[in-house]
Structures are given as C-alpha cells and as structure tokens.
Design a protein with these regions (language model features):
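NAD(P)+-binding Rossmann beta1-loop-alpha1 motif at the extreme N-terminus of oxidoreductases
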Residues: 1-52, 128, 190-192
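Short acidic capping loops at alpha-helix termini that bridge into adjacent secondary structure
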Residues: 16-19, 79-81, 197
C-alpha cells in the first residue's frame, strides 16, 4: 500500500518524486520503488527519514508498527510533523500508547501529538481510490492537509474512528467484491458467445460507465435501473433471476461478514 500511495501522489502531481522518502528493509523493495522514479529517495533508516518529513505515513504490516514507532518517535516534532498510519487494526489509542504521548506532551507544552488513521483502497494508485480518515489531536489545518493528500488519490472523507472497520468492508474489501462481480459477468459473457478478451473489455467498460453515470448525475442507482427496465423486458427478467438467486442479500451478507 505504501508504494501505491507514493505512486499515486506522484501521478496526481500532489508531490514531486524528490519530495518523497520511502523506507524499506528490503533492498529489493527499495529498488522497485526507484524503478518507478529514480528521483524518489529511498533508505532503510526509519528514524532518519522521519526526521526530515512533515508528514510521516506508516504503511507497514500491523505487527511491525511497534518496532517502527520505536525508531521514529524519539525525534518527533509536534510543531511541524504529523503521523498517518494505514496499518489495519491499529487504533489511534494504540498509536498514542506506542508514541509515549505523555512524554511528548511534556516536550510540547501539554499539547497532544496529531495522529491520523487512513484506510485507502488499492485504487489510490490509479487516482480512483477511496480513503477513510480518522484523527486525534490535529488542527483544522492538519486535517485539511491530510484530506488534500488523499483526495488527490480519489475520494477521501473524515469519519469517526468507529466507522473505520465498516469503511474497510465497503471500500477496501469492496474492491474485491466488485472484482468478483466483474469476473462472474465476464464468465457469463463467454458463455453467451464472446471471446474472453472481448467479454473482459465489455464488462470493464460497462461497470465504469455505470459508476460514471452515478457520479456525474448524482442519481440513485434505482433511477438509472428504471431507465433501462421496461415492462416484460429482458432487463427485468435478468434482475429478477439475480434476486431469486440471492444477489442483494449475498452482497449485504458479504459486507457484514467483512465488518470485523
């Protein structure tokens, strides 16, 4: 996810490659980052990289957060830095505990350090992502900065932290759920007589068109469905067959199961 965010920030023009410092333990990972743009600075020293940064994005596996926070926290500067974690399941309270917030507050006159959680989905790399943002201790200016960063990668919204799990199910897991529909429709297209590559392009553009119609019109999905559904027609027959097989219930059940 860290690589996807970095590539998206560069692609959107929000950041210049030379403004980014990407750290990773593996040289193979660092090399892959530089292959995208040689101007991106890479390294393995998290503490040194964090000391230079205004915005520190923790894009590591949850079980690595404790180690990384231990490396970067001694040099944190409340006056100019914020931390944004995209580690799944790591709460704002967890971040505060790992940072040793009381000692930080002593250094900065009692103010709390600004922490953010961000849950982006993988489409941020193509600037069509969805990112949920929660925060604690941040100023309006800092909230605006983080929102601008992730809005450059698609759609970003600030939510209460208790909705982060639901957001993960709806948008992050939702990418996989949408892909499963696309795969099923592609297979159906092949059964109807199209070649696999033809079916793939048809379904991809159909889904893109459906989403674009909603985004540009602001209409409810049912209003767009009504436009192509006539009495006794083939669309209503197809919709009814899908509902008989439990389409809507299956989607809702999948979202609820993923909301843990």
């Amino acid at each position: 996810m860290g690589g996807a965010i970095a590539r998206g920030l560069i692609k959107s023009g929000m950041c210049r490659p030379e403004d980014l410092i990407c750290t990773a333990k593996s040289e193979a990972t660092r090399s892959k980052i530089r292959e995208y743009d040689a101007a991106i600075r890479t390294g393995s020293n998290n503490g040194a990289a964090a000391a230079e940064a205004d915005v520190i994005i923790l894009a590591v596996k949850p079980w690595h957060v404790t180690e990384v926070m231990g490396e970067i926290c001694p040099g944190l500067d409340l006056g100019r830095q914020i931390i944004v974690s995209v580690a799944a399941g790591v709460t704002l309270n967890d971040l505060e505990q790992l940072a040793g917030t009381p000692s930080l507050e002593e250094r900065v006159g009692g103010r709390s350090f600004p922490f953010f959680r961000a849950i982006p989905n993988t489409a941020v790399e193509v600037l069509c992502g969805v990112t949920f943002i929660a925060q604690h201790g941040a100023t309006e200016e800092q909230i605006g900065l983080v929102c601008r960063l992730f809005s450059a990668l698609g759609y970003a919204l600030v939510v209460d932290e208790k909705l982060m799990s639901a957001g993960t199910a709806l948008a992050s897991c939702g990418i996989a759920f949408a892909m499963r529909y696309i795969r099923a429709a592609m297979e159906g297209g092949v059964e109807l007589g199209f070649r696999p590559e033809e079916a793939a392009r048809i379904v991809e553009h159909t889904v893109k068109g459906a989403a674009t119609l909603l985004l540009e019109s602001g209409a409810h999905p049912e209003a767009e469905i009504d436009k192509v559904t006539t009495a006794g027609g083939i669309t209503i027959k197809g919709l009814n067959a899908m509902e008989k097989a439990g389409f809507t219930a299956a989607v809702i059940d999948g979202l609820k199961a993923a909301n843990v």
